[in-house]
């Protein structure tokens, strides 16, 4: 594949120098910014993540800062999640939908104050959507992209590494909660979260100038922990059932189709509520399922049709071989008629038809 041409439109990150020194082998573009995809190999990176600790440049998870007297009003309008239950130190997974109930993004919200939230984005320009709603409604709120770049520390030794840099207080942070902890005299939001199921943290680095000092401090502190540079790993992600916006779900899908119905609990009249009413009552006609694909498969770069008796009954959005489980793991959007565990069908890959079986759930 051709390389990515350097441009101001494709932004480097505060950690890019460290990523390059660590020998990054591949990038993708995410929110107009570089996101590393592989260092050694997908398989080796995955095995290391599951045993040791990695530092991930996920600065591409850009923040939308929503601040002002009407910040909560806007948050309640753009997401079906009940925001009134959010604690002061909490992070919330907040699907955002359009007027038809289609997914626009699935960010993590960080509550900084009663009138100030960050939305940590998946791949999509949600800032413009929020700004447009705020202007149209005349809300008293400021919406900007702040100089905040997340750095993730993931893996079973993440607590040990983080404690060496931020102190033992990190061990007390609960899942999807955060503390403000000091680094070089600057308090940073440190949350127990991340795009893996290996455990770890995301550090919201305020100020690009702190990027490399923090990167270097983590590597200096973790030499005996076998710390390495890493990145979200597609094998571990699919095994874990972590959905990728743009791959496993798009604006053509609703939260209910994505298995996110439990996050549609707002009593407010949010954008898209009327459109989602039927699915809220009766459930969706299709939904995300874990799948096993037989045979050898190529890289999944496009949606692969799922077929049964010559009729399309869904599609595969992500698929890859799992060395740990010895099968091709996949995430698919499957029609109700064929989503029961054990149901067999076929998938049309670029290399031909392959057998597919629906699983009870994901691998972890």
From Swiss-Prot:
Disulphide bond pairs: none
User: Entry's SUPFAM superfamilies?
Assistant: Aminomethyltransferase beta-barrel domain (SSF101790), Folate-binding domain (SSF103025)
* Induction cue: By dimethylsulfoniopropionate (DMSP) and acrylate.
Q: Which InterPro entries match?
A: GCST_C, GCV_T_N, GcvT/YgfZ/DmdA, GcvT/YgfZ_C, TrmE/GcvT_dom1
Q: From its record, what is one biological process in GO terms?
A: methylation
- Which keywords fit this entry according to its UniProt record? Methyltransferase, Transferase
Summarize how pH affects activity. Optimum pH is 7.0-8.0.
* Catalysed reaction, written as an equation: S,S-dimethyl-beta-propiothetin + (6S)-5,6,7,8-tetrahydrofolate = 3-(methylsulfanyl)propanoate + (6S)-5-methyl-5,6,7,8-tetrahydrofolate + H(+)
> EC annotation?
2.1.1.269
Consequences of knocking out this gene:
Loss of DMSP demethylation to MMPA. 25-fold increased sensitivity to acrylate, growth is strongly inhibited by 20 mM dimethylsulfoniopropionate (DMSP). Disruption of this gene has a polar effect on acuI, the downstream gene, which accounts for the increased sensitivity. Dimethyl sulfide (DMS) production is enhanced.
Which terms in the Gene Ontology molecular function aspect does this entry carry? methyltransferase activity
Q: In this entry, which stretches build a coiled coil? A: none
Report the protein's function: Involved in the assimilation of dimethylsulphoniopropionate (DMSP), an important compound in the fixation of carbon in marine phytoplankton, by mediating demethylation of dimethylsulfoniopropionate (DMSP) to methyl-mercaptopropionate (MMPA). The intracellular concentration of DMSP is estimated to be 70 mM.
- Listed NCBIfam families: PRK12486.1
PANTHER family recorded: AMINOMETHYLTRANSFERASE, AMINOMETHYLTRANSFERASE, MITOCHONDRIAL
Query: What protein family is recorded?
Result: Belongs to the GcvT family. DmdA subfamily.
**Misc remark:** DMSP is used as an intracellular osmolyte, predator deterrent and antioxidant.
Query: What is this protein's name?
Result: Dimethylsulfoniopropionate demethylase DmdA
- Organism of origin is Ruegeria pomeroyi (strain ATCC 700808 / DSM 15171 / DSS-3)
């Amino acid at each position: 594949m051709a390389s990515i041409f350097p441009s101001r439109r494709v932004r480097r990150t505060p950690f890019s120098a460290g990523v390059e020194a660590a020998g990054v082998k591949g990038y993708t573009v995410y929110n107009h910014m570089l996101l590393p995809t592989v260092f050694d190999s997908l398989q080796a990176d995955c095995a290391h993540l599951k045993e040791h600790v990695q530092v991930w440049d996920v600065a591409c998870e850009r923040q939308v800062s929503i601040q002002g007297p009407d910040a909560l009003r806007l948050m309640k309008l753009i997401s079906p999640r009940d925001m009134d239950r959010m604690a002061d130190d909490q992070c919330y997974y907040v699907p955002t939908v359009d007027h038809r109930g289609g997914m626009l993004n699935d960010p993590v919200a960080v509550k900084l104050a009663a009138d100030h939230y960050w939305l940590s984005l998946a791949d999509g320009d949600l800032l413009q959507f929020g700004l447009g709603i705020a202007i149209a409604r005349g809300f008293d709120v400021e919406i900007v992209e702040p100089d905040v770049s997340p750095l993730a520390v993931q893996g079973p030794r993440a607590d040990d590494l983080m404690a060496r840099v931020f102190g033992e207080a990190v061990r007390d942070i609960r899942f999807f909660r955060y503390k403000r902890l000091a680094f070089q005299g600057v308090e940073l939001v440190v949350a127990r979260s991340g795009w893996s199921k290996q455990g770890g943290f995301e550090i919201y680095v305020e100020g690009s100038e702190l990027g490399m000092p923090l990167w270097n401090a983590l590597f200096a502190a973790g030499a005996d922990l076998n710390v390495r540079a890493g990145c979200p790993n597609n094998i571990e992600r699919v095994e874990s059932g972590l959905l990728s916006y743009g791959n496993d779900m798009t604006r053509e899908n609703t939260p209910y189709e994505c298995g996110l119905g439990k996050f549609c609990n707002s009593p407010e009249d949010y954008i898209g509520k009327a459109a989602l009413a039927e699915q809220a009552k009766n459930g969706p006609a299709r939904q995300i399922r874990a799948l096993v694909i037989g045979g050898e498969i190529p890289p999944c770069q496009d949606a692969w049709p799922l077929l049964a008796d010559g009729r399309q009954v869904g599609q595969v959005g992500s698929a890859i071989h799992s060395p740990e489980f010895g099968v091709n793991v996949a995430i698919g959007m499957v029609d109700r008629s064929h989503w029961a565990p054990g149901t067999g069908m076929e998938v049309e890959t670029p290399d031909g038809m392959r057998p597919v079986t629906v699983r009870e759930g994901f691998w972890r």
